[in-house]
Amino acid sequence: MTSLNSTALAVLLAFAPASAVLAETTPANYVPPLATTPMNRIVQDNAYQQLDFFFKKLVTEKEGIIMDGTSPFKSGDKFLPGKVAAGLGHVLLNTPKDDPTLEQKLKDYREIADMTVGMDNHTWGIYYYIGTLVKLKQAGLLERAVSPATLEKLRKQLDWRTFVTPQWDLISLPTNYYGVAFSIARLRMLMGWEDDSAGKVLLEKMLTHYKKYSGKFGFSDETDGEGRFDRYSILLIAEICERFLETGLQPTDELKGLLRKAADIALNVANTGGVGFSFGRSLGPYGETALVEILSVSAYLNVLTPEEKQYAYAFSSRVAARYMDFWYDPAMHSLDMWGKGRRTDTYRGKHRILGENFSLLHQLLSTNDMWNDAGFKDVQPKADLQAWLDKNCPQFSVTTFAQGDYDRALAIFRDGKHVVSLNMINGGISQHDNSPYYPLPFAPGIVSGVADAGAAHAQLLPKFTMADGTQLIGAAWIKDIKTAKDGQRYTISYRQDELDLLGKRSPVKDARIKLHTTYKLEHGRMTRTDVYTPVGTQEVQKISLEFASFSDQATIQGNTVTFAQGDVKEYSVSGLQQCQSAPTNGNQDFMAPYGAMKTLVTCSTGKLTLKEPLTIQWTVKYQ
């Protein structure tokens, strides 16, 4: 019987179309199994189970806890005590008052609070901790959850003054930490630990900072004017509105207007897979929960229309569903941002495994609460999300971040299930040479950057090695962004009068070669054309262009590579002498936040004397 079935199956497979046999799951066609399950059910049935596991593990193993071979309390995670307090606090707050297990949970929580009170806990950790204490107080659980001696220590420790001077200056921190300080001051007031005077000053500081660094377009520069705009720049206004709400204040109409701009971007990058931002740092699950934060607070504040709320909620449910299926690994009892060919930012390394679990679950729980309060508790998500996005989101949109000496903007191109994000900014100090900050058409499964990888393999940017050994890429000094439409083809062009000289922590202008770049985006195809014009005669040692692709089974003919598997079907280059392709074989240099690239295509030209403009073009065709 078995052999008959096997033979029958073999015959069926032999005559089946290839697509039926090998129905590839790529990032663009991935759909989470719980895609149409209400967000509240996903959270209740999964997130709390994960928190219960961590609670029991902490009670048993205490500060000696081991997670997938790492020791979280020996990792130097400066936020961990606050994240532990918040994560386990969710369990207490979700346990009914008449539940017989509540008393033991409160006792265990008290012991863990006693254990962590002597540990380092900074800024965000303070914010997480005091926010939980306020909720426990409001629920009437505080006295049973935290001992008087520990609460007195926390009253002294959980203080914005630990990172703000008496002159109201931040102590060696980016200016967006004024928002953290403001929240802590307001939460201390709600605890009865201080009056509202400091909160008022810090609120003014926070809003002044936001206005200074967001200019007239409303998105916050992550640097002191260098022009780094990324997921944080878009998320920050939502965080500010959340801080108002959690401390009993109503956001102003001006803040709601800025939030609407962020919501527009969030809707424009929404998709059926629950995938998040594709550019900048701190992606993976954080790129996804960021969108849910923006959309949930926008829904709660009625910044979205009733119809937009329905589909923003449908997308948010898919993000939660994706977290449980894609990011969470039941065998590890943890999310996994570090295995399976995935690579994340150094500061989110595996040593922070426990804190990362707690902070992401906290974000899912908090945004779920916001959706519940907005009227969506246990609501069945709309199933026709793709059709709605196709109909209501512009196929092409441009959001300006800054204008002046340099232009900074985000172009979004929607092509069916693919969402292409071309972020034209300057990564600035510490990020300018990292590919997630390059002006590339990022799209999951098609083009991705590699976190903290530097420019050793400058993804899809021609790299000039000059005769003096210096290396240049066109990454930072973008001017004169222009867009045009020709039928269903969209064109974006810009110029750079200086290239980015590599090797320093900050970008350095190098005026030996000028660059004019044109992108053409159309259905199934993206083309970049670069015209490099030397200032005088320039001696070049080598030009190289690398593309790390998620597609594999590559065949190369001349300077065209075709792929048998993956979303990218063809990659072709002109203007360089030769190309070669090779499998990446799991090399860490070629890993995106959500998985490994499979093939590296390298094109290059040897020594040349550059007197005339040189055109280099690449085209990616995808399905």
Model-identified regions with their sequence ranges:
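Gram-negative bacterial Sec-dependent N-terminal signal peptides
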Residues: 1-22
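Trp- and S/T/G-rich repeat-edge/linker motifs of beta-rich repeat architectures
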Residues: 56-61, 104-112, 152-165
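Extended polysaccharide-engagement surfaces of secreted carbohydrate-active enzymes
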Residues: 272, 291-593, 623
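Short Pro-Gly-centered flexible turn/kink motifs
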Residues: 606-622
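Helix-loop junctions that connect tandem helical modules in alpha-solenoid scaffolds
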Residues: 70-74, 112-119, 161-171
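An alpha-helical repeat/solenoid feature that recognizes helix-turn-helix modules
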Residues: 73-95, 119-139, 174-192, 230-234, ...
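Low-complexity, Ser/Thr/Pro/Gly-enriched N-terminal "stalk/linker" regions
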Residues: 24-104
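Extracellular polysaccharide-recognition and catalytic grooves
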Residues: 152-392
